[in-house]
UniProtKB/Swiss-Prot annotation:
GO terms for biological process: neuron differentiation. Isoform a and isoform b are differentially expressed: isoform a is maternally expressed in the animal half of early cleavage stage embryos, and zygotically in the sensory vesicle and the visceral ganglion lineages from the neurula stage onward. In contrast, isoform b is expressed only zygotically in the endoderm, notochord and mesenchyme lineages during cleavage stage. GO terms for molecular function: DNA-binding transcription factor activity, RNA polymerase II-specific; RNA polymerase II transcription regulatory region sequence-specific DNA binding; zinc ion binding. This is LIM/homeobox protein Lhx3. SUPFAM superfamilies: Glucocorticoid receptor-like (DNA-binding domain) (SSF57716), Homeodomain-like (SSF46689). It is found in: Nucleus. Residues 410-469 bind DNA. Residues 99-133 have a biased composition (Acidic residues). PROSITE patterns: HOMEOBOX_1, HOMEOBOX_2, LIM_DOMAIN_2.
Amino acid sequence: MNLMFHQARNNNSFMVAATSNQQHHKTALHVLEDKASGQVYDNQRIIASEQHSYGEYYIDEGKENSIPSESSARDYCGKELNKMASVTKESYVGGRLVDEDEDDYDDEGDREVYEDDITFDDDDDDENDDDDSDVKMNLRTNVNKLRFDSGFEYTLPTSSPENMTSFNPMSDSSHLFSDYSKHNSTILANGKSGTSYLTSTPRRIYDNTNMINIPEETKNIPTCYNGNNHVPSESIFDNPLSSGANRRMTSPGHKIQPSTCSDMLFTLLAKDNKIEAEIPKCTGCEHRIFDRFILKVQDKPWHSQGLKCNDCSAQLSEKCFSRGNLVFCKDDFFKRFGTKCTACGHGIPPTEVIRRAQDNVYHLEGFCCFLCHEKMGTGDQFYLLEDNRLVCKKDYEQAKSRDADIENGVKRPRTTITAKQLETLKSAYNQSPKPARHVREQLSSETGLDMRVVQVWFQNRRAKEKRIKRDTGRQRWGHFFSRNQLPSGPTSPISAPVTTGQKKRSNTKCGNRLIHCKDNQQNSQSHSSPLDGSPVFPIGSIGTGMQGEIGASFQSGCAVGIEGTSDLPSVMDPKNLPPYSETLMSYTEANPSHFVHGQNPSDVTYMNTLPVGGSHVPLTAVPQHNISAFSLPFHMEGNMVPDPSTQFMMATGHLGSQDTDLVSNSSGRSNFSDLSASPGSWLGELEHVQPF
């Protein structure tokens, strides 16, 4: 018997073939042993041989000789394979350990194989015997299925004329699996031992369609296709390097659907940690690289088809740019990491023409004024602001001029009106404060002023009249108001008590008079306003008219309001006057909070108004038909403080000189009738203003 031990140069796996030549009896036994695990699959009969993707693989054929039995060959092969697991870069040929450089041992005689030893017995001298000659088989995928007692399935390749096959070191890993087929293309039933089969040398072969030809009788065998190779399903194992849900584990006798042929190959190779460490890992996907070609970028390996631009996914073949573990094409690299345009912030390729402003770089299209968006060319003067924005010279000077005017307080030119023009406008205003359009046009032509100027003058004049009227009323009635309490003096302070409870009071209307009275027991309580419930202090009833005199009437605990002139004797009757009191004082201009003069209750002229210049003018009895009085309550929430310098109405009821001047100066005509004797006409205008 001739034992052929074929070893890959990378010392990963071994294949042992034992053949016997007897009369009408030939036996083939193929065993695949894995070096890393040390396990011998001798009961599986035939398993596809393997080879490392970076080494050359040479397989020699030996000669056939007879062996006593199949079991003896199996036992011997098992022992020898266990020894071969630790042998590197050496081969067993004919049962003898030789170096790689030594020629294959070729004994032309017959050999007898025993369990413990190998002896050679030459019993046949015919070298040209068809049964003894070497059979050269090709790698055509004429696959047949054989069944043995163990129940495992295997396939055999067809014959080939070559004796040795050399694989490219950088060939694809899917072509490293060999197939076997029967010599006579027949199918044997299970348990048929003693039938002769011939082994063949595995090699690659491609047909015209670049596909695998599978016989009809073997199409029911689960197979795996990868490239141009056909691999039996029993040789598929889990690949520890592959990721995903397709990873499966199998054992002899358990059929699974294989994932890929690469998984099967590298699962066997990965059992050796040294070999796994030598397989490069792709920098991009971090998977092992088993391609024929490897691309390197800065000494970092990449898949040949995986070197793509990180931004545009363009295939990089000649030149690329890297940053860290990322690779880019030229355009995308400069867009991301190149010089940025100050205006738009985008990257500028090195081939593009740019403009510079100090340390700033701009696109040609982005070098423009940010105000007028006018593109600036070569030789144009521009200004660079603090925020790196560009301004053309024209816009910069205009903006600078406006800023200077604001800082210096320069206002728009104002229209000057002469005295003659002013007299014409005042005369027209006295006739009509709101002239029509045709009147304004006539005034514009007479005065030579613009029509818009005439219109604005009338608007300002009306606003001034309204403002003067409001200010005059505020000065006249403001001394009646103060905050929280009446002014008090050292002699007789008068304070407004806070109302803690509302007492019952009676309202009596006598004719046209409305009298609010309260009980005599409530003299210590202050009155309440009939409008908002705030405490009030009863002051006298004061009336003003063009021909009337000022009259006042005080009554203890009462505020009398007279709307007409009937029943006036009852009001002016001395018995209705308040009793004599030392606390009744008259206001003075210097200190309006003091009542400094005692009054005689029998004299109706004891009350004094506020005189001009601080002198006290006694009141005289007035005719009944000239009295027009009203009730003036004092609100404690008021914030009005009397102004000592204010000129009030004289005792005669006529306006003072200062009031007359204010009215006469407001316009060319007399507006005396517009000034109301009551603050009700202008207090409503101040509701939205904070009290004073």
